[in-house]
Amino acid sequence: MEYKQDIETAVSRATDGKLRTDNWQYLLDVCDLVKEEPEDGAQYVMEAIDERLQQADANVILRSLSLVACLSENCGSRVQQAVASKRFTGLLYYLIEDKHVHATVKREIAKVVDQLSSSFQRDPSLKGMSDLLQKIIRRYPHLVAEPKLPQKREMSADAKLQEDQDLEEALKLSLQEYEQQQRHNGGQPPQQAPAALASETSLPEQPQPQIVRRVKAIFDLNASEPDELSFKKGDVITVIEQVYKDWWRGLLRGKVGIFPVNYVGVCPEPTAEEVAKEAAQEHAVFAQAGNVENLLQKLRVSQNVDVTHEDEISELYSTVTPLRPHVTKLIGKYAQKKEDLASLREVLANAEATYNMMLEKATCYSSSNFMPSTQHRTYQPSGQAAPYSNYEFSQPSTNVLPPRPASYSVNPQVTGLPVHQQRSVPENTEIRYRSYSGDLPHT
Protein backbone atom coordinates (compact mmCIF):
# COMPACT_ATOMS: atom_id res chain seq x y z
CA MET A 1 0.00 0.00 0.00
CA GLU A 2 2.85 2.34 0.77
CA TYR A 3 4.38 1.57 -2.64
CA LYS A 4 1.14 2.61 -4.36
CA GLN A 5 1.04 5.87 -2.41
CA ASP A 6 4.63 6.62 -3.39
CA ILE A 7 3.74 6.17 -7.05
CA GLU A 8 0.65 8.36 -6.75
CA THR A 9 2.68 11.07 -5.04
CA ALA A 10 5.38 10.93 -7.71
CA VAL A 11 2.78 11.06 -10.50
CA SER A 12 1.06 14.05 -8.90
CA ARG A 13 4.37 15.89 -8.65
CA ALA A 14 5.38 15.12 -12.25
CA THR A 15 1.97 16.23 -13.60
CA ASP A 16 1.45 19.26 -11.38
CA GLY A 17 -0.60 21.95 -13.09
CA LYS A 18 1.82 24.63 -11.91
CA LEU A 19 4.57 23.21 -14.12
CA ARG A 20 4.85 25.13 -17.38
CA THR A 21 7.30 22.66 -18.92
CA ASP A 22 8.13 19.00 -18.40
CA ASN A 23 10.40 18.34 -15.43
CA TRP A 24 12.40 15.34 -16.58
CA GLN A 25 13.77 14.67 -13.12
CA TYR A 26 10.23 14.14 -11.83
CA LEU A 27 9.36 11.97 -14.83
CA LEU A 28 12.40 9.75 -14.32
CA ASP A 29 11.60 9.46 -10.63
CA VAL A 30 8.27 7.88 -11.58
CA CYS A 31 10.06 5.52 -13.96
CA ASP A 32 12.45 4.44 -11.21
CA LEU A 33 9.56 3.62 -8.88
CA VAL A 34 7.77 1.58 -11.53
CA LYS A 35 10.91 -0.42 -12.30
CA GLU A 36 11.15 -1.56 -8.68
CA GLU A 37 8.07 -3.79 -9.11
CA PRO A 38 7.13 -3.92 -12.81
CA GLU A 39 3.93 -5.95 -12.32
CA ASP A 40 2.27 -3.83 -9.65
CA GLY A 41 4.07 -0.65 -10.64
CA ALA A 42 2.61 -0.66 -14.15
CA GLN A 43 -0.90 -1.09 -12.76
CA TYR A 44 -0.58 1.59 -10.10
CA VAL A 45 0.99 4.18 -12.38
CA MET A 46 -1.64 3.73 -15.11
CA GLU A 47 -4.43 4.11 -12.56
CA ALA A 48 -2.89 7.34 -11.33
CA ILE A 49 -2.46 8.62 -14.90
CA ASP A 50 -6.08 7.79 -15.77
CA GLU A 51 -7.19 9.95 -12.89
CA ARG A 52 -4.95 12.83 -13.96
CA LEU A 53 -6.15 12.71 -17.58
CA GLN A 54 -9.76 13.18 -16.48
CA GLN A 55 -9.07 16.51 -14.79
CA ALA A 56 -10.18 19.78 -16.35
CA ASP A 57 -6.76 21.45 -16.09
CA ALA A 58 -5.21 21.37 -19.56
CA ASN A 59 -1.72 21.70 -18.13
CA VAL A 60 -2.20 18.56 -16.03
CA ILE A 61 -3.25 16.64 -19.14
CA LEU A 62 -0.21 17.86 -21.10
CA ARG A 63 2.20 16.83 -18.33
CA SER A 64 0.42 13.45 -18.05
CA LEU A 65 0.88 12.81 -21.77
CA SER A 66 4.61 13.48 -21.43
CA LEU A 67 4.71 11.01 -18.53
CA VAL A 68 2.97 8.35 -20.64
CA ALA A 69 5.56 8.76 -23.41
CA CYS A 70 8.42 8.62 -20.90
CA LEU A 71 7.08 5.47 -19.22
CA SER A 72 6.55 3.74 -22.56
CA GLU A 73 10.15 4.34 -23.57
CA ASN A 74 11.79 3.41 -20.25
CA CYS A 75 9.69 0.92 -18.28
CA GLY A 76 9.41 -2.19 -20.43
CA SER A 77 6.64 -4.31 -21.89
CA ARG A 78 4.24 -4.23 -18.92
CA VAL A 79 3.71 -0.52 -19.18
CA GLN A 80 3.61 -0.68 -22.99
CA GLN A 81 0.82 -3.25 -22.90
CA ALA A 82 -1.14 -1.09 -20.47
CA VAL A 83 -0.67 1.99 -22.66
CA ALA A 84 -1.76 0.14 -25.82
CA SER A 85 -4.75 -1.47 -24.10
CA LYS A 86 -8.27 -0.87 -25.34
CA ARG A 87 -9.23 0.89 -22.11
CA PHE A 88 -6.42 3.46 -22.24
CA THR A 89 -6.66 4.12 -26.00
CA GLY A 90 -10.41 4.59 -25.52
CA LEU A 91 -9.70 7.23 -22.87
CA LEU A 92 -7.38 9.08 -25.23
CA TYR A 93 -9.95 9.02 -28.01
CA TYR A 94 -12.60 10.27 -25.59
CA LEU A 95 -10.42 13.32 -24.95
CA ILE A 96 -10.07 13.83 -28.70
CA GLU A 97 -13.85 13.91 -29.12
CA ASP A 98 -14.57 16.01 -26.02
CA LYS A 99 -15.67 19.49 -27.09
CA HIS A 100 -14.50 21.01 -23.82
CA VAL A 101 -10.87 19.95 -24.39
CA HIS A 102 -8.68 22.64 -25.93
CA ALA A 103 -7.40 22.15 -29.48
CA THR A 104 -3.80 22.39 -28.25
CA VAL A 105 -4.37 19.42 -25.94
CA LYS A 106 -5.96 17.42 -28.75
CA ARG A 107 -3.00 18.08 -31.04
CA GLU A 108 -0.64 16.98 -28.28
CA ILE A 109 -2.63 13.76 -27.81
CA ALA A 110 -2.40 13.06 -31.53
CA LYS A 111 1.33 13.79 -31.45
CA VAL A 112 1.93 11.37 -28.55
CA VAL A 113 -0.20 8.69 -30.23
CA ASP A 114 1.85 9.08 -33.41
CA GLN A 115 5.08 8.79 -31.44
CA LEU A 116 3.94 5.69 -29.54
CA SER A 117 2.60 4.09 -32.71
CA SER A 118 6.06 4.37 -34.28
CA SER A 119 7.67 2.89 -31.15
CA PHE A 120 5.20 -0.03 -30.96
CA GLN A 121 5.13 -0.94 -34.66
CA ARG A 122 7.48 -3.93 -34.27
CA ASP A 123 5.26 -5.60 -31.65
CA PRO A 124 1.92 -6.93 -33.02
CA SER A 125 0.49 -7.15 -29.49
CA LEU A 126 0.67 -3.36 -29.24
CA LYS A 127 -1.39 -2.79 -32.38
CA GLY A 128 -4.03 -0.86 -30.44
CA MET A 129 -1.98 2.35 -30.59
CA SER A 130 -1.58 2.23 -34.38
CA ASP A 131 -5.32 1.53 -34.71
CA LEU A 132 -6.02 4.62 -32.63
CA LEU A 133 -3.73 6.67 -34.85
CA GLN A 134 -5.51 5.56 -38.02
CA LYS A 135 -8.85 6.38 -36.42
CA ILE A 136 -7.68 9.88 -35.56
CA ILE A 137 -6.30 10.39 -39.07
CA ARG A 138 -9.62 9.38 -40.65
CA ARG A 139 -11.86 11.55 -38.48
CA TYR A 140 -9.58 14.37 -37.35
CA PRO A 141 -6.80 14.69 -39.96
CA HIS A 142 -6.08 18.30 -39.01
CA LEU A 143 -4.78 17.15 -35.62
CA VAL A 144 -2.05 14.95 -37.11
CA ALA A 145 -0.90 16.59 -40.31
CA GLU A 146 1.44 19.54 -40.00
CA PRO A 147 1.40 22.11 -42.80
CA LYS A 148 3.65 21.32 -45.73
CA LEU A 149 6.63 23.51 -46.39
CA PRO A 150 5.86 25.89 -49.27
CA GLN A 151 8.10 26.07 -52.30
CA LYS A 152 10.68 28.82 -52.45
CA ARG A 153 9.26 30.73 -55.38
CA GLU A 154 10.63 34.12 -56.31
CA MET A 155 8.37 37.10 -55.81
CA SER A 156 6.85 38.56 -58.95
CA ALA A 157 7.81 42.01 -60.16
CA ASP A 158 4.37 43.36 -59.23
CA ALA A 159 4.69 41.97 -55.70
CA LYS A 160 8.11 43.56 -55.25
CA LEU A 161 6.80 46.86 -56.59
CA GLN A 162 3.83 46.72 -54.23
CA GLU A 163 6.14 46.00 -51.30
CA ASP A 164 8.33 48.99 -52.19
CA GLN A 165 5.25 51.20 -52.46
CA ASP A 166 3.97 50.02 -49.08
CA LEU A 167 7.33 50.75 -47.50
CA GLU A 168 7.50 54.19 -49.07
CA GLU A 169 3.96 54.96 -47.90
CA ALA A 170 4.79 53.78 -44.39
CA LEU A 171 7.86 56.03 -44.26
CA LYS A 172 5.82 58.97 -45.53
CA LEU A 173 3.13 58.47 -42.91
CA SER A 174 5.75 58.07 -40.20
CA LEU A 175 7.30 61.38 -41.21
CA GLN A 176 3.92 63.11 -41.13
CA GLU A 177 3.21 61.64 -37.71
CA TYR A 178 6.57 62.90 -36.44
CA GLU A 179 5.87 66.41 -37.75
CA GLN A 180 2.45 66.43 -36.10
CA GLN A 181 4.00 65.32 -32.83
CA GLN A 182 6.54 68.14 -33.05
CA ARG A 183 3.73 70.67 -33.50
CA HIS A 184 1.78 69.14 -30.62
CA ASN A 185 4.81 69.41 -28.33
CA GLY A 186 5.04 73.16 -28.88
CA GLY A 187 7.64 73.21 -31.61
CA GLN A 188 7.37 75.61 -34.53
CA PRO A 189 5.66 74.00 -37.51
CA PRO A 190 7.96 73.58 -40.50
CA GLN A 191 7.51 75.99 -43.35
CA GLN A 192 5.78 74.46 -46.32
CA ALA A 193 5.14 75.73 -49.75
CA PRO A 194 1.52 76.58 -50.66
CA ALA A 195 1.48 73.83 -53.27
CA ALA A 196 2.57 71.28 -50.69
CA LEU A 197 -0.10 72.48 -48.27
CA ALA A 198 -2.74 72.26 -50.97
CA SER A 199 -1.71 68.74 -51.94
CA GLU A 200 -1.67 67.68 -48.28
CA THR A 201 -5.18 68.97 -47.67
CA SER A 202 -6.58 67.60 -50.91
CA LEU A 203 -5.30 64.04 -50.48
CA PRO A 204 -7.66 61.79 -48.52
CA GLU A 205 -6.29 60.16 -45.40
CA GLN A 206 -5.00 56.71 -46.31
CA PRO A 207 -4.75 53.85 -43.83
CA GLN A 208 -1.22 53.01 -42.85
CA PRO A 209 -0.16 49.66 -44.35
CA GLN A 210 0.36 46.97 -41.75
CA ILE A 211 4.02 46.04 -41.40
CA VAL A 212 4.69 42.69 -39.78
CA ARG A 213 7.53 43.07 -37.29
CA ARG A 214 7.15 39.98 -35.12
CA VAL A 215 5.61 36.55 -35.56
CA LYS A 216 5.00 33.67 -33.15
CA ALA A 217 5.72 30.06 -34.09
CA ILE A 218 2.67 27.79 -33.99
CA PHE A 219 4.59 24.64 -35.00
CA ASP A 220 8.08 23.25 -34.46
CA LEU A 221 10.46 23.46 -37.41
CA ASN A 222 13.83 21.75 -37.79
CA ALA A 223 15.83 23.37 -40.57
CA SER A 224 16.74 21.08 -43.46
CA GLU A 225 18.95 23.60 -45.27
CA PRO A 226 21.74 25.90 -44.01
CA ASP A 227 19.82 29.11 -44.74
CA GLU A 228 16.67 28.03 -42.88
CA LEU A 229 15.78 28.98 -39.30
CA SER A 230 14.95 26.36 -36.68
CA PHE A 231 12.45 27.20 -33.95
CA LYS A 232 10.07 25.73 -31.40
CA LYS A 233 6.40 26.37 -30.91
CA GLY A 234 5.90 29.62 -29.02
CA ASP A 235 9.15 31.28 -30.12
CA VAL A 236 8.79 34.93 -31.14
CA ILE A 237 10.71 35.74 -34.34
CA THR A 238 11.68 39.23 -35.46
CA VAL A 239 10.86 39.66 -39.16
CA ILE A 240 13.58 41.21 -41.31
CA GLU A 241 12.27 40.95 -44.86
CA GLN A 242 10.28 38.87 -47.31
CA VAL A 243 12.59 36.68 -49.38
CA TYR A 244 10.22 34.44 -51.34
CA LYS A 245 6.49 34.45 -51.86
CA ASP A 246 5.82 32.26 -48.81
CA TRP A 247 9.15 32.57 -46.96
CA TRP A 248 10.40 35.38 -44.76
CA ARG A 249 13.80 36.10 -43.24
CA GLY A 250 13.87 36.54 -39.48
CA LEU A 251 16.03 36.75 -36.37
CA LEU A 252 15.80 34.38 -33.40
CA ARG A 253 18.33 34.10 -30.57
CA GLY A 254 21.09 35.70 -32.62
CA LYS A 255 20.54 33.51 -35.69
CA VAL A 256 19.24 34.79 -39.01
CA GLY A 257 17.45 32.52 -41.47
CA ILE A 258 14.36 32.06 -43.59
CA PHE A 259 11.16 30.39 -42.41
CA PRO A 260 7.76 29.48 -43.95
CA VAL A 261 4.90 31.84 -43.21
CA ASN A 262 2.39 29.00 -42.66
CA TYR A 263 4.33 27.89 -39.58
CA VAL A 264 3.91 31.20 -37.75
CA GLY A 265 1.22 33.65 -36.71
CA VAL A 266 1.45 37.43 -36.72
CA CYS A 267 1.97 39.15 -33.38
CA PRO A 268 -0.23 42.27 -33.52
CA GLU A 269 1.47 45.49 -32.56
CA PRO A 270 -0.03 47.13 -29.45
CA THR A 271 -2.17 50.20 -29.95
CA ALA A 272 -1.41 53.54 -28.36
CA GLU A 273 -4.07 52.92 -25.70
CA GLU A 274 -2.59 49.52 -24.85
CA VAL A 275 0.90 50.97 -24.60
CA ALA A 276 -0.32 53.74 -22.31
CA LYS A 277 -2.23 51.26 -20.14
CA GLU A 278 0.80 49.00 -19.84
CA ALA A 279 3.03 51.94 -18.93
CA ALA A 280 0.54 53.03 -16.25
CA GLN A 281 0.46 49.53 -14.74
CA GLU A 282 4.24 49.37 -14.73
CA HIS A 283 4.45 52.77 -13.05
CA ALA A 284 1.95 51.62 -10.41
CA VAL A 285 4.08 48.57 -9.64
CA PHE A 286 7.26 50.57 -9.20
CA ALA A 287 5.39 53.13 -7.10
CA GLN A 288 4.74 50.41 -4.51
CA ALA A 289 8.45 49.69 -4.04
CA GLY A 290 8.51 51.86 -0.92
CA ASN A 291 5.64 49.91 0.66
CA VAL A 292 7.42 46.62 -0.05
CA GLU A 293 10.60 47.86 1.62
CA ASN A 294 8.58 49.23 4.55
CA LEU A 295 6.79 45.89 5.02
CA LEU A 296 10.05 43.97 4.91
CA GLN A 297 11.64 46.27 7.46
CA LYS A 298 8.69 45.97 9.86
CA LEU A 299 8.71 42.18 9.55
CA ARG A 300 12.39 42.11 10.44
CA VAL A 301 11.84 44.27 13.50
CA SER A 302 8.70 42.40 14.64
CA GLN A 303 10.02 38.86 14.44
CA ASN A 304 8.81 37.96 17.95
CA VAL A 305 5.45 39.74 17.65
CA ASP A 306 2.17 38.26 16.48
CA VAL A 307 1.75 40.01 13.14
CA THR A 308 -1.97 39.19 13.02
CA HIS A 309 -2.52 41.87 15.66
CA GLU A 310 -0.47 44.48 13.85
CA ASP A 311 -2.92 46.51 11.75
CA GLU A 312 -0.20 48.40 9.90
CA ILE A 313 1.58 45.23 8.82
CA SER A 314 -1.70 43.64 7.74
CA GLU A 315 -2.60 46.71 5.71
CA LEU A 316 0.80 46.82 4.02
CA TYR A 317 0.64 43.12 3.25
CA SER A 318 -2.81 43.42 1.67
CA THR A 319 -1.50 46.32 -0.41
CA VAL A 320 1.60 44.65 -1.86
CA THR A 321 0.28 41.09 -2.28
CA PRO A 322 -1.74 41.89 -5.46
CA LEU A 323 1.50 43.05 -7.08
CA ARG A 324 2.87 39.53 -7.46
CA PRO A 325 1.27 38.66 -10.85
CA HIS A 326 2.21 42.07 -12.24
CA VAL A 327 5.81 41.65 -11.10
CA THR A 328 5.94 38.19 -12.69
CA LYS A 329 4.63 39.64 -15.95
CA LEU A 330 7.22 42.42 -15.89
CA ILE A 331 9.99 39.90 -15.26
CA GLY A 332 8.93 37.96 -18.35
CA LYS A 333 8.67 41.15 -20.39
CA TYR A 334 12.14 42.40 -19.54
CA ALA A 335 13.63 38.92 -19.82
CA GLN A 336 12.39 38.82 -23.42
CA LYS A 337 13.79 42.29 -24.05
CA LYS A 338 17.12 41.23 -22.59
CA GLU A 339 17.19 38.18 -24.87
CA ASP A 340 16.33 40.32 -27.91
CA LEU A 341 19.07 42.82 -27.09
CA ALA A 342 21.60 40.05 -26.50
CA SER A 343 20.71 38.56 -29.90
CA LEU A 344 21.05 41.96 -31.53
CA ARG A 345 24.44 42.48 -29.89
CA GLU A 346 25.64 39.11 -31.15
CA VAL A 347 24.52 39.83 -34.70
CA LEU A 348 26.12 43.28 -34.57
CA ALA A 349 29.40 41.83 -33.28
CA ASN A 350 29.46 39.24 -36.06
CA ALA A 351 28.75 41.89 -38.68
CA GLU A 352 31.47 44.14 -37.29
CA ALA A 353 34.01 41.31 -37.26
CA THR A 354 33.14 40.38 -40.85
CA TYR A 355 33.44 44.00 -41.97
CA ASN A 356 36.83 44.45 -40.29
CA MET A 357 38.12 41.24 -41.85
CA MET A 358 37.01 42.33 -45.33
CA LEU A 359 38.50 45.78 -44.77
CA GLU A 360 41.81 44.27 -43.72
CA LYS A 361 41.90 42.04 -46.80
CA ALA A 362 41.16 45.02 -49.04
CA THR A 363 43.94 47.05 -47.39
CA CYS A 364 46.46 44.24 -47.82
CA TYR A 365 45.49 43.83 -51.47
CA SER A 366 45.86 47.55 -52.16
CA SER A 367 49.21 47.67 -50.38
CA SER A 368 50.60 44.78 -52.39
CA ASN A 369 49.73 46.55 -55.65
CA PHE A 370 51.68 49.70 -54.68
CA MET A 371 54.79 48.01 -53.20
CA PRO A 372 57.83 48.81 -55.43
CA SER A 373 60.37 46.19 -56.37
CA THR A 374 63.01 45.62 -53.70
CA GLN A 375 65.61 44.33 -56.12
CA HIS A 376 69.01 46.04 -56.19
CA ARG A 377 69.29 48.24 -59.28
CA THR A 378 71.88 50.60 -60.77
CA TYR A 379 70.83 53.88 -62.28
CA GLN A 380 72.39 54.89 -65.59
CA PRO A 381 70.76 57.55 -67.73
CA SER A 382 70.70 56.89 -71.41
CA GLY A 383 72.91 58.97 -73.63
CA GLN A 384 75.31 60.00 -70.84
CA ALA A 385 78.98 59.37 -70.24
CA ALA A 386 80.32 56.28 -68.58
CA PRO A 387 81.07 57.94 -65.20
CA TYR A 388 77.35 58.01 -64.50
CA SER A 389 77.51 54.28 -63.93
CA ASN A 390 79.35 55.03 -60.72
CA TYR A 391 76.13 56.32 -59.15
CA GLU A 392 74.33 53.40 -57.62
CA PHE A 393 70.78 53.47 -56.18
CA SER A 394 69.21 50.93 -53.89
CA GLN A 395 66.09 50.71 -51.73
CA PRO A 396 66.49 51.42 -48.01
CA SER A 397 66.83 48.43 -45.77
CA THR A 398 63.89 49.39 -43.57
CA ASN A 399 60.50 47.97 -44.50
CA VAL A 400 58.60 51.22 -45.04
CA LEU A 401 55.46 51.39 -47.16
CA PRO A 402 56.17 53.97 -49.91
CA PRO A 403 53.65 56.65 -50.81
CA ARG A 404 51.91 56.91 -54.16
CA PRO A 405 54.17 57.36 -57.23
CA ALA A 406 52.92 60.92 -57.73
CA SER A 407 54.81 62.07 -54.65
CA TYR A 408 58.15 60.54 -55.58
CA SER A 409 60.98 63.11 -55.67
CA VAL A 410 64.72 63.44 -55.17
CA ASN A 411 66.59 66.48 -54.00
CA PRO A 412 68.42 67.83 -57.10
CA GLN A 413 71.13 69.33 -54.91
CA VAL A 414 72.04 65.82 -53.79
CA THR A 415 71.91 64.00 -57.10
CA GLY A 416 72.66 66.67 -59.64
CA LEU A 417 70.33 64.90 -62.07
CA PRO A 418 68.10 66.62 -64.62
CA VAL A 419 64.59 67.42 -63.43
CA HIS A 420 62.86 65.17 -65.97
CA GLN A 421 64.95 62.24 -64.68
CA GLN A 422 64.51 62.98 -61.00
CA ARG A 423 60.81 61.91 -60.99
CA SER A 424 61.69 58.34 -61.81
CA VAL A 425 63.70 57.91 -58.62
CA PRO A 426 61.60 56.82 -55.62
CA GLU A 427 61.51 58.84 -52.45
CA ASN A 428 63.84 57.88 -49.57
CA THR A 429 66.26 56.36 -52.10
CA GLU A 430 69.76 55.88 -50.78
CA ILE A 431 72.59 57.10 -53.00
CA ARG A 432 75.89 55.39 -52.57
CA TYR A 433 79.00 56.95 -54.15
CA ARG A 434 81.82 54.94 -55.55
CA SER A 435 85.31 56.38 -55.89
CA TYR A 436 85.18 59.08 -58.54
CA SER A 437 87.79 61.72 -59.16
CA GLY A 438 86.19 63.84 -61.84
CA ASP A 439 83.63 66.65 -61.73
CA LEU A 440 79.97 66.12 -62.39
CA PRO A 441 78.88 67.25 -65.82
CA HIS A 442 76.88 70.46 -65.96
CA THR A 443 73.51 70.59 -67.70
Curated annotation (Swiss-Prot):
GO cellular component: endosome membrane; ESCRT-0 complex; vacuolar membrane
Entry superkingdom: Eukaryota
Alphabetical list of CDD domains matching this protein: GAT_Hse1, SH3_GRB2_like_C, VHS_HSE1
Protein transport as UniProt keyword: yes
Domain VHS: 14-144
PROSITE patterns: SH3, UIM, VHS
SUPFAM superfamilies assigned to the protein according to its UniProt record, in alphabetical order: ENTH/VHS domain, SH3-domain
Pfam families the record matches: SH3_1, VHS
Subcellular location: Endosome membrane
GO BP annotations, alphabetical order: ATP export; microautophagy; positive regulation of protein maturation; protein secretion; protein targeting to vacuole; protein transport to vacuole involved in ubiquitin-dependent protein catabolic process via the multivesicular body sorting pathway
SMART domains: SH3 (SM00326), VHS (SM00288)
Biased composition (Polar residues): 374-383, 391-400
InterPro entries: ENTH_VHS, SH3-like_dom_sf, SH3_domain, STAM, UIM_dom, VHS_dom
Residue ranges of domain SH3 in the record: 210-269
Keywords: Endosome, Membrane, Protein transport, SH3 domain, Transport
Membrane topology: Peripheral membrane protein
GO MF: phosphatidylinositol binding; protein domain specific binding; protein heterodimerization activity; ubiquitin binding
Domain UIM intervals: 162-181
Residue numbers spanned by region Disordered: 178-206, 374-443
Quaternary state and interactors: Component of the ESCRT-0 complex composed of HSE1 and VPS27.
Function: Component of the ESCRT-0 complex which is the sorting receptor for ubiquitinated cargo proteins at the multivesicular body (MVB).
Protein family: Belongs to the STAM family.
Name of this chain's protein: Class E vacuolar protein-sorting machinery protein HSE1
Taxonomic source organism: Eremothecium gossypii (strain ATCC 10895 / CBS 109.51 / FGSC 9923 / NRRL Y-1056) (Yeast)
Taxonomic lineage of the native organism: Eukaryota, Fungi, Dikarya, Ascomycota, Saccharomycotina
